[in-house]
Amino acid sequence: MTVKEKKGGQFLDIRCCDNLELMAEIKDNTVDLIYCDILYGTGRKFADYQDLKPKRGIIEEHYIPRIKEMHRILKDTGSIYLQMDTKINHWIRCILDDVFGYDKFQCEIIWTYGIGLKAKSKKFHTHNDNILLYSKNNNHVYNPQMKKLEKPSKRWVTKMIKGVNTPVRDNNGKQETYYVTEVKYGNVWDDIPMRRNGIIYKTEKPKKLIERIIKASSNEGDLVADFYAGSFTTAEVCKDLNRNFIGCDINPNGIAKAKERGLFSFTDKPDKLD
């Protein structure tokens, strides 16, 4: 099943299929950005799908061929973000190191969503996801995302002399200052709450999280892919941000719910994906 939309040159190509089938249709070096909220390896059976068992052999059997395909279709200037939790992130990082190269690892984003801890738990409470960011090469697209400070921060103006920071002073000898009103986001994101009671999945990711990723690693008109698309929140964000989209989910309910979100009208299959 395929439903596509095209408006003013922008296209959304949404599929209900296994992601390996879709990636096999895409040419080498075509996609600008890949974001996937992957299977977390809980081993649990949910209403609409069976999650992978948390065993290394099973995880590798599923992800190695898929990550190899993602590397093939990604442009030289492209980046890949894979989101998971602490159960399998160490295994996924090893796969990404092997496929993309250890030196292409850019950072691990910690998205902490602050859900209350269980009082009886005999371990440190985990309330974060891990988002692994790799680039295909070192000339990848990166647009710094800025965080506004609630209270401007007072900083001294300094200059570098032989590697030493020294104060900058005016003609009267008074040290000059400036006020910082915004800073670049680091790799710990604690300002986006978890979205509960999602359209299909209880832990559907919030639009603000995906928006930050797409803005940081793509430009308008670029092609963004999501091969574990769920209810296609990534497609909706792409539509809002004037990015093109291709992606899939194996669950037919994802397509049905994406239609309900008003994502579709018409399109022809883009030639550059053949």
PLM region descriptions:
Residues 253, 268-274:
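Conserved glycine-bearing catalytic or ligand-binding loops at nucleotide- and phosphate-handling centers
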